[in-house]
Amino acid sequence: MQKQVVVMDEAAIKRALTRVSYEIIERNKGTKNLALVGIKTRGIYLAERLHKRILEIEGIDVPVGDIDITLYRDDLSFKDDKTREPAVHGTNIPFDINGKKVVLVDDVLYTGRTVRAAMDALMDVGRPAQIHLAVLADRGHRELPIRADYVGKNIPTSGNERVEVRLTDVDHSEDAVIINKNE
């Protein structure tokens, strides 16, 4: 039997993203040379929300893009097992990242493998001055030496739990961060 526990509702997510937006601005001493890059899929929508908050706070329209890490993963998935053709969705970074302070944005930080793949993909696009990481939820259990610079909420979990982020933009349900527990 699976039990679901909501650890962040829509209001908590909004507050966390507002706080993270302020932290990004403060740590970078403004928005000069700042860019946001969301990791497909939910990282894209979170990056867009951070972009909106930063625009509201600073009045500056920082560039925002998205990155597909499919070909950089060490657990590559395929759209067709017969042809072994990877399911690639494409990267959209419509600005020069060279010399920029890039904030990678993702929904959940777990093992660190997704972030490693995203950094590899980003370095193939250009050479940013800095790469920071913003996540909505950090659940621990790292396999690689990676940490988030900006965290919406730390959510300690056990190995048999899964953290799921639902966003109205992509999941067509209310915004929520849910822990799924196998019992």
UniProtKB/Swiss-Prot annotation:
| Residue window of motif PRPP-binding | 102-114
Which positions are annotated as binding substrate?
41-42, 106-114, 139, 163
User: Which keywords, in A-to-Z order, does the entry hold?
Assistant: Glycosyltransferase, RNA-binding, Transcription, Transcription regulation, Transcription termination, Transferase
Q: What is the reaction catalyzed?
A: UMP + diphosphate = 5-phospho-alpha-D-ribose 1-diphosphate + uracil
Query: Does the record's keyword annotation contain tRNA-binding?
Result: no
Which GO annotations describe the biological process of this protein? DNA-templated transcription termination
Any keyword Glycosyltransferase?
A: yes
EC number(s) reported in the record: 2.4.2.9
SUPFAM superfamilies listed in its UniProt record:
PRTase-like
UniProt-recorded Gene Ontology molecular function terms: RNA binding; uracil phosphoribosyltransferase activity
Q: Which NCBIfam families does the annotation name?
A: PRK05205.1-1, PRK05205.1-4, PRK05205.1-5
Q: Which family does it belong to?
A: Belongs to the purine/pyrimidine phosphoribosyltransferase family. PyrR subfamily.
Q: How does the annotation summarize its subunit structure? A: Homodimer and homohexamer; in equilibrium.
Its job: Regulates transcriptional attenuation of the pyrimidine nucleotide (pyr) operon by binding in a uridine-dependent manner to specific sites on pyr mRNA. This disrupts an antiterminator hairpin in the RNA and favors formation of a downstream transcription terminator, leading to a reduced expression of downstream genes. Also displays a weak uracil phosphoribosyltransferase activity which is not physiologically significant.
HAMAP family found in the cross-reference section: PyrR
Put simply, this protein is called Bifunctional protein PyrR
